UniProtKB/Swiss-Prot annotation:
The lineage of its organism: Eukaryota, Fungi, Dikarya, Ascomycota, Pezizomycotina. This is Thioesterase pynI. Residues 136-145 have a biased composition (Acidic residues). Disruption phenotype: Aabolishes the production of all pyranonigrins. It comes from Aspergillus niger (strain ATCC MYA-4892 / CBS 513.88 / FGSC A1513). Residues 136-167 are annotated as: Disordered. Thioesterase; part of the gene cluster that mediates the biosynthesis of pyranonigrins, a family of antioxidative compounds. The first step of pyranonigrins biosynthesis is performed by the hybrid PKS-NRPS synthetase that condenses 6 malonyl-CoA units to an acetyl starter unit, to form a 1,3,5-trioxotetradecane-6,8-dienyl-ACP. The enoyl reductase (ER) domain of pynA is likely to be functional during the first two rounds of polyketide chain extension, to generate the saturated C-C bonds of the alkyl side chain. PynA subsequently forms the amide bond between the acyl chain and L-serine.
Length: 280
């Protein structure tokens, strides 16, 4: 997983960079589908846009504010927490962009470990399929054989370039599987007030890009939990409390959560992001 992914724009631009945080997979690759987020076709004058695989890399990109943060799904949840942490350090966060991100404080906990495992495995399979790597979904956690192959040099043999590339790819997907399991558990165990204290104010503007279509499947096995997740998805602000921010607005898009970066919708998402960034 690349810790910092340069998505587009001039790295030396005087414009404030937009930093996207990874979604549940731990990868920032979905943001690569976005079109030009600058109102210019001149690469030398375009806003730099990055994706990061961990919040800690924001300081490497930008030691001090003002910050522009954003994220899809879990990435938006993390962006809100990052904004609070940065402001506690006296940094300015100009804008947080939530791409269909539900407030995790309202997200229901898993009923049991089995539900968590099944749902996390299902999400992992979906990500693999979206990346055109469906064949890796079933064997990415089979570390023993790959460990033996990686250690082959100990007995004097070496892997071919093709074998090494295959080994690295499987290790990437194994890491992604573990990340999805840890991330889904983290989201479902976020207690009220853990992300933002109820009466606190995070001094930033927040724009929520909300999908109006419900996903075809709900990540839950039990009906009570399914209903709770659907209520969250139908909520006008996806359960965020506008009073927790200086400014909160919602933009609607006729799409489903998992299709935001598909060819059918990505042009509209790009246009929305350009509109948001015009004032930044």
């Amino acid at each position: 997983m690349e810790p910092i992914l340069h998505i587009q724009g001039d790295a030396h631009s005087s414009l404030t960079p937009l930093i996207f945080i990874h979604a549940v997979s731990g990868l920032a690759w979905p943001y690569m589908a976005l079109g030009n987020l600058s109102n210019t076709s001149d690469p030398a004058r375009s806003r730099p846009v990055y994706g990061i695989s961990s919040p800690v890399y924001s300081s490497e990109l930008q030691p001090h504010g003002p910050y522009l943060l954003g994220g899809w799904s879990m990435g938006g949840m993390i962006a809100v927490k990052m904004a609070e942490i940065l402001q506690a350090k006296k940094e300015t966060v100009q804008q947080v962009i939530l791409l269909d991100s539900i407030n995790p404080e309202k997200y229901p906990a898993f009923v049991n470990e089995e539900e968590h495992r099944i749902i996390a495995d299902g999400l992992f399979t979906n990500v693999c399929q979206a990346m055109g790597m469906a064949d890796l979904a079933d064997d990415s956690d089979d570390e023993d054989n790959r460990s033996d192959a990686s250690d082959a040099s100990d007995d004097g043999s070496t892997m071919s370039d093709e074998e090494e590339e295959d080994d690295n790819l499987h290790r990437l997907f194994s890491t992604m599987r573990r990340h999805i399991h840890a991330s889904t558990l983290s989201i479902s165990s976020t207690e009220p007030g853990k992300l933002l204290p109820p009466n606190s104010v995070c001094h930033t503007s927040v724009t929520l890009v909300k999908c109006t279509q419900l996903s075809e499947t709900v990540p839950a096995l039990f009906s009570a939990r399914q209903r709770c997740i659907r209520r969250c998805a139908l909520h006008p602000t996806l359960q965020w409390r506008p009073q927790n921010f200086d400014r909160f607005r919602t933009l609607l898009i006729d799409a489903r959560h998992d299709s935001l970066f598909d060819e059918e919708h990505v042009e509209e998402v790009t246009s929305m992001l350009r509109q948001i960034l015009e004032s930044c």
